[in-house]
Amino acid sequence: MGRAYCGFIDVGYLRAQGSRACGIPGGQAQLQASACVDWLQIVLPHQAAGFAGLSFLRAYWYDGALEPHHAGSSEQRHVFDGIAFTPGVQLRLGHLAERRTNRLQRPIEQAMRSAAGDLGIGADELVAAFNRHWTWRPERQQKGVDTLITLDMVRLAQSGAFHTAVLLAGDRDLAEPVRTAQDAGCRVIVATVGGQASLAKELAQLADEVIEIPQDSLAAMVTGPTRSRPAQSRAAEPTEQ
């Protein structure tokens, strides 16, 4: 078995939990791929046990891509191209499904009408004013990302490509590939954002070790629009996500 370690980064998890931990609105959070590699290569070996004699192989970066006809696809492709040029990163893309829903709109409008009644003001006028200042955006959900993580982790573990896997994710569905990698003789460390509250219980129980990304490293990984930096110094394209 190779004396190497790999990172498996679920970008959806890092974006959601990282933006919350850093106090950045989710829609404004930009992920810095080069900072993630820095953490894996420089910080992690001093943070967790068992890295003596191990070399960093690469980080697999899992995200969802919009459909080619989507208005935001061109800009997203530009970002992905930059990430793909980041040294030490291999980009792996699932799909980003988008759907319009009134799942939140109805209960919010009902709450506003109740509040209007308590305040003695017109409910219709309040709701109409709110809708003039608020845009109901479609919900987005990653598809196929967990499958890609599963396939890569199992394939690489069974081929002996790595000794240790560092999984930055929290989904319960990833418990099975973790178990399979361990059965192949590999060690699996699960890295969390915000502690085990963001981690599925089964994943936490299976992990050989659970660690939390330090706040200073996290702040470099997840930046706001005014604090962003190039995701890596060798590529001409920006890689913030």
Predicted regions and their residues:
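Nuclease catalytic cores that cleave nucleic-acid phosphodiester bonds
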Residues: 92-241
